[in-house]
Amino acid sequence: MTLSSHVIGSGSPATFLHGFTQTSHSWLELVEHLPLASTLVDAPGHGESADGQRSLTQIGDDIAAIMPTGCLVGYSMGARMALHTALQHPHKVTSLVLISATAGIRDADERSARKNSDDTLANHIEDVGVTTFIDEWLSQPLFAGLNSATNQRQDRLRNTSRGLADSLRFAGTGTQEPLWDQLRDLTMPVLLLCGTTDTKFHSVALEMA
């Protein structure tokens, strides 16, 4: 699958992967201020990359096929995709930035429960439609500090209910095989980031480091 992408700016190459319900446009306000040639990618099931029926392994190949050799940056869902890309195609990734990342759920029962939860949410998205779901999604405490100018609601509404649902079914956290034992195989510099109040991913980042 050829993912939709576009390049902003000039300079050293860097590729950016957004989180669930976002699109490549979510990075615009940031990358416009960076001295980089930034490749902004629509993940499968998001934006102009409408087909969400891609596994994380397939997505790693898809990203490597379109990105220039350089830095790879991913947030949340995009961080999991970036990690797969770096492990599968290390020659394409000179440095790796993972924001709110995880290397997967180790426990098989917990992973299965998360897969069931992701599937239930996917069905719900298709039942209620993208507008209702995005409003539900943005009402979570995680986004409490955002307002209409910063929550990117209009951009998120560019997605489709089918695309988001398939993204969860095929590449949700519950589908990810644990990559903890493979972290030692990363040969490029890696930067792990999380929000100052994000205690969950702060703990995960410390464990991944």
Residue map of PLM features:
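Conserved acidic catalytic loop of the alpha/beta-hydrolase fold
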Residues: T57-C71
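Conserved serine/cysteine hydrolase catalytic core
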Residues: N159-E207
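Active-site signature of alpha/beta-hydrolase-fold catalytic machinery across serine-
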Residues: E29, H84-Q88
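Helix-loop "lid/cap" segments that line or gate small-molecule binding pockets
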Residues: D119-I125, E136-N147, S167-G174, L193
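Conserved HGGG/HGGXW glycine-rich cap/lid loop of the alpha/beta-hydrolase fold
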Residues: L3-A50
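Gly/Ala-rich beta-loop-alpha elbow adjacent to hydrolase catalytic centers
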Residues: G74-G78, A82
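Flexible "cap/lid" loop of the alpha/beta hydrolase fold
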Residues: L87, T94-I125
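Short beta-strand immediately N-terminal to the catalytic nucleophile in serine-hydrolase-like folds
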Residues: L72-G74, I99
